[in-house]
UniProtKB/Swiss-Prot annotation:
It is found in: Cytoplasm. It comes from Actinobacillus pleuropneumoniae serotype 3 (strain JL03). It comes from the Bacteria. This is DNA polymerase IV. Binds 2 magnesium ions per subunit. Disulfide bonds: none annotated.
Length: 356
């Protein structure tokens, strides 16, 4: 019998804002957000819990945030500091395991299956890690502990902020059976509405459904939906895997048929893509991101992708890609549009310089 895995998902609490409050204690207890200025048509990168009481959230336009919360204290992004603190957190992780998969600066998966510290208890290990982060860095973290990767991520939100939640092998089956499908990664508003129309609300409902029907109705995602609902998640924690690209996509409430409609969606996706890039690559120019791609998924669930190396990241370049890939629709409706960009590397930069 295979060894039951022990997975921890660590998620820092309002990370950037928490660092700013640590650096300037006068901010504690006040609504604080990290983000761009109104003049620069900026958006919030994150905000603390005091600000969230006013309905503020990440990616909200700064101008809108200030209308909701006139006393909001806006702090500019300090990416070098956030990256330095993130590395300090990862040094704490590595005291317990080398199998660490970062998802962003403020969250990561840890595989502690073979860790012998804390008598091998993943629960105690997570608590020790969170204690160390607080004692050494004066920041709080939340954690989810489970035998499966997707479950660990889901339950890390369960006792936020500054808490943790455990799914043991013994209670995993019952927990998954009652788990709302909207909690599963990848189930957005549109997919959740479609599931609800079919009378599917929990993983238990999927368990009682026909496998072929789920696969046919939801395409490739149907396989993940079926497996997660049956407590199957064999994805490994990929240690030291550098992320090579970033993607954003939108499953549409209703299929579209016209290029003009698609261009409006690309506009919104481009803003979201730039926001996420600036969150993790704030010190890099958008012109350094040269390899772009666009994806269309059609009403029949087939999909196509077009990738190009360009002179840099811009809305105009994505619109050009959209106009080219739209020729492949062949009178089919479009149900999803996605944009992606490859991260620049030193090797790629040197190669490109030869042609500048």
């Amino acid at each position: 019998m295979a060894t039951q895995r022990k997975i921890i998902h660590i998620d820092m609490d309002c990370f950037y804002a928490a660092i700013e409050m640590r650096e300037n204690p006068a901010l504690i207890g006040k609504p604080v957000a990290v983000g761009g200025s109104v003049e620069g048509r900026g958006v919030l990168t994150t905000c603390n819990y005091e600000a969230r009481k006013f309905g503020l959230h990440s990616a909200m336009p700064t101008a809108q945030a200030l209308k909701r919360c006139p006393n909001l204290i806006l702090v500019p992004v300090n990416m070098p500091l956030y990256k330095a603190v993130s590395e300090q957190i990862h040094q704490i992780f590595r005291r317990y395991t080398d199998i660490v998969e970062p998802l962003s600066l403020d969250e990561a998966y840890l595989d502690v299956t073979d860790c012998r510290q804390c008598s091998g208890s993943a629960t105690w290990i997570a608590q020790e890690i969170r204690d160390a982060i607080w004692n050494e860095l004066h920041l709080t973290a939340s954690a989810g502990i489970a035998p499966l990767k997707f479950l660990a991520k889901i339950v890390s939100d369960q006792n936020k902020p500054n808490g943790q939640f455990v799914i043991s092998p013994e209670n995993m089956t019952a927990f998954i059976y009652d788990l709302p499908l909207k909690k599963i990664p990848g189930v957005g508003k549109v997919t959740n509405e479609k599931l609800a129309q079919l009378g599917l609300h929990t993983c238990g409902d999927i368990q009682h459904s026909d496998k072929a029907f789920i696969y046919k109705t939801f395409g490739k995602f149907g396989q993940r939906l079926w497996e997660f609902s049956h407590a199957i998640d064999n994805r490994k924690i990929e240690a030291n895997r550098p992320r090579k690209s970033l993607a954003v996509e939108n499953t549409l409430p209703t299929d579209i048929w016209h290029l003009a409609e698609a261009e409006q969606i690309v506009d919104e996706l481009f803003k979201k893509l730039v926001f996420r890039l600036q969150r993790n690559w704030g010190e890099r120019s958008l012109q350094e991101f040269k390899k772009l791609a666009i994806k269309l998924k059609f009403g029949d669930f087939t999909q196509t992708t077009l990738e190009r190396t360009t002179d840099g990241l811009s809305r105009e370049r994505f619109i050009e890609l959209l106009q080219q890939v739209w020729q492949r629709t062949n009178r089919r409706s479009v149900r999803l549009i996605g944009l992606s960009v490859h991260y620049p590397t030193e090797k790629v930069k040197k190669q490109l310089n030869l042609w500048e």
